[in-house]
Structure formats: structure tokens, C-alpha cells
Amino acid sequence: MTDKLIIFDTTLRDGEQSPGASMTKEEKIRIAKHLERMKVDVIEAGFAASSNGDFDAIHTIAGLVKDSTVCSLARANDKDIQRAADALKPANSFRIHTFIATSPLHMEKKLRMTPEQVYEQARLAVRFARKFTDNVEFSPEDGSRSDMDFLCRVLEGVIAEGATTINITDTVGYGVPEMYGNLVKTLRERIPNSDKAIFSVHCHNDLGMAVANSLAGVMIGGARQVECTINGLGERAGNTSLEEIVMAVKTRKDYFGLDVGIDTTQIVPTSKLVSQITGFVVQPNKAVVGANAFAHASGIHQDGVLKARDTYEIMRAEDVGWTANKIVLGKLSGRNAFKQRLQELGVSLDSEAELNAAFMRFKDLADRKSEIFDEDIIAIVSQESALAQEQEHFKFVSLSQHSETGEQPHAKVVFSVDGKEVTGEARGNGPVDATLNAIESEVGSGSELLLYSVNAITTGTQAQGEVTVRLSKSGRIVNGVGTDPDIVAASAKAYIAALNKLHSKDDKLNPQRS
């Protein structure tokens, strides 16, 4: 019988720690729904004790997700664990994931605790977590730099207290594949009760080896859970990439001999959603989900693929969710045709009101753009879902701008503030700068623009532009996304979306690491 590899997604927790990737509750819910549709085994929805916002997001996701196990991180203390348990109460299936640092450096410099104190606190934490669930995970933070004898003692102790998953962390991405794989193997061999728990790997990508280290932990070490994120999202250089782990194991089943339960056709749609929400653009040559992942420029390669796809393609683009860039609808298409195409794309809206609003946006786009592609429809629905779920303090109404060679462009933006229309006018170094200045002339947010990027949703000169802006204020970083065939209008929408997030403030109370 083939072993199953458990996929533990931590996009909503560890992925969110990437500077600028902070998500609203509504955005987390949208991603969680996609992860469930992808059949992810465990969704780490956040860190309940870190903020009221994270608690609420976990609590809501726990009530909505039915087919995946929902998890919350908790430090090794009763208060954090109680908070996690309270947040997870609505879940069909839940896990508490508790952690404490075990490396000499972390114990001395960060925790200011002796090894004996850490050992006792780890055991007590797992014992307390078991009062709420028999699904308890323990992580020794900075495990790859911990003393082997001490690490074995701690892990033996927490397994004795009832930990069912032991997660070996390479917190700073210091490991190399053979070393890390042997670390997991040695732990499993030396700990007398290791057979009572599933071993897991959690690797960071600081040296570009997160995926390789994770796979070594599986093949050499015998781990049967991989902790990962969509697009490898995470602080510093990121985390282990879910899509790369899944497709490596599926494509090379002859080597790994493992099964994963993931619906791989949901990988690309989920990747695009995470990229849109966080503002982190996927590099074109990124494995599996990059725009060039299945592109062939070499004439020899193109000829080979045309004759037989498996000459240069080891997996099929459609198997991971890439769809042909085809024209599907036009301005004469009706609501039923639009709804049917959404169903074919596996896209759902929460209410008839959202469907009607999305259809009106589609009709508006069709009047301005002769060719409507699947990607346009997905962008419309994503934008509508975001607008329906976010609280719109500011709302874009209209834009006019004028520019001539040798003169500074002028922009006039009409938008509403809590339902009351205001008009901002300003000049700038370009039409986009003038537009954002016009908005700021009325808002006066005092924020700093950290990022402005534009991507074409489809090909051709009529393509919709997708603009991402990242704003910073008082140490808080937010993203906003806007789409429109007019790049300047898309920029205004993105900026206003970011301002709405700044307006609904939810700061983290406690730092989180693993």
C-alpha cells in the first residue's frame, strides 16, 4: 500500500509573515475556500493569540471549512493554547500547533530559559492542548540548530504527553538536503516512541533549498507531512512551495512512492488568487505556476512538443490548472451564459447579489473590450468578491485626466467617502502620479507608496491591466489591487482599495515564528 504524504498549508499563517503580505479576514476566507477546494489536508489559518483579527479569521474559517483540518498556531503556554482552542471550536476537524525554541542560541538569547525549563514547558503545553483535541502538533523552533541529545529528549517527552505530529523546523533555512534528511532520520531512530507520531518537515528558503530539504526529509528521514505555502510565500526568502512539492511527488511517483490527495487542477487558480491578494507577483520562470513554466521558445523544443508533448514536457499544463487563453464571451452574452462559464471555471460567488454585480461589471467590460477571455472573467469575479466582503469607506466613481507633451499631467478623481462624493484634483510627474495625488488631496492619508506594479491579465493591446499598490503607514503595510482596461483607472482603484485596508486597522499583538 502506498504511503500518503500529508500536505499542511501555512499560507495564511507563515506566508502572511512576509512583509506586505498581511491579509484581511475576508481575504483569508477566500484563500481558505480555495485551499479546501484543492483538498489540502491541513490549513493553518493563523495564530489566534496574535490579534483579535486573526482569532476572528480562524473562528470563521473553522466554521466554513468542512473537508480540511483547520489549525491554529500557539506558543507553549496555556493562554495561547486556550485562545487557539476557542478559535477552533466551530471546526469539524481541528489541530492545535504549539511550539517553543530548542536551540542553545534561542533558549539563551530569546527565551532566557534553561534547557530544563524549556523541556518542562514543552511537555506541559502538549498536555494542556490534549485537553481540547487528540490532534496536537509540536514544533521545536530552530530545530535544525538544536543539540541532538536535547532535541531527542524534548521530542520523546512531548510524544509521551500525546503529541501526534512532530514538526522539524529549519527556521532560518540553514539546512542542506542530506544533512536535514539525516536529522529527521536520526530523530526517528533515536527517539524510543517516535512510532507514536507522524514526523513533519518545515523548511525556509534562505539558501534556495526549502523544497530540496523538505523532499530529503521525506525520502531520507521518513517524514510524512510537509509544511508549505502557495507560491512559496513567506518572510525573507520564503517557505517551501506547495505546488513544487505536490508536483514533484506526483510526477516522480516512481521515485517517491507516495500519494498526495491534492486536486492539482486548482493549483494555478489558487496561485493567482494568492498573488493578487498579497501583491507578490509570481516570477515568470517559477516552476509549475510561472507564466513561462510551459512555454517553449527554442525551435527544436517547439518542434518536439508539437510532435509529442512528452519530449519536453514532464507534466501537462492543464493538470495544474492552466487553461487555454481563449475568447469565451462577448457583449451579446447573457447572464445565464456568464453564470454557466463561471461554473465551468469552478468559480463560485456567495450570493445572487454578487453574481448580478459581477455580471454588470462583465457587461461594462464587454462594451469597452471586444474580446473577453477566461482570465478577464476570473479577474472580474475576484474583484467583485473582494468588494462585496470588504468594508468600503472609500469607493471609486470616475476619473478624468489630461496630459500634453512638455506639461505636467492633470487628473480629477471622483470618489465617495462613506457614501458622500468628493472630487480631488492634482498634477503629477505622470498620469498615474497625478491621479494618486488627486486622491491624496482629499484623503490626506499620510501613507508611503512602497510598491506600484502593473500586469496584463491577458495578451494584446486591449488587455485589462491589473495594478497592485503597497502602502505603509505607522509600520503597517497593506496591498490594494485594481483592474481596468485603462491603467490609470486601475491605479486609482488599487490605491483606493489599499486606503480601505488602512482604514480598517488590525495590528498583530504578538510576533510569530516557526
Curated annotation (Swiss-Prot):
Pfam families: HCS_D2, HMGL-like, LeuA_dimer. The keyword Transmembrane helix does not apply. GO terms for molecular function: 2-isopropylmalate synthase activity; acetyl-CoA C-acetyltransferase activity; manganese ion binding. It is an enzyme of class 2 (transferase). Signal peptide: none annotated. Mn(2+) binds at residues 14, 202, 204, 239. InterPro entries: 2-IPM_HCS-like (IPR050073), 2-isopropylmalate_synth_dimer (IPR013709), AIPM/Hcit_synth_CS (IPR002034), Aldolase_TIM (IPR013785), LeuA/HCS_post-cat (IPR054691), LeuA_allosteric_dom_sf (IPR036230), LeuA_bact_synth (IPR005671), PYR_CT (IPR000891). It comes from the Bacteria. Its cofactor is Mn(2+). Keywords: Amino-acid biosynthesis, Branched-chain amino acid biosynthesis, Cytoplasm, Leucine biosynthesis, Manganese, Metal-binding, Transferase. GO terms for biological process: L-leucine biosynthetic process. Its EC number is 2.3.3.13. Belongs to the alpha-IPM synthase/homocitrate synthase family. LeuA type 1 subfamily. NCBIfam families: leuA_bact, PRK00915.1-3, PRK00915.1-4. This is 2-isopropylmalate synthase. It comes from Burkholderia multivorans (strain ATCC 17616 / 249). The gene is leuA.
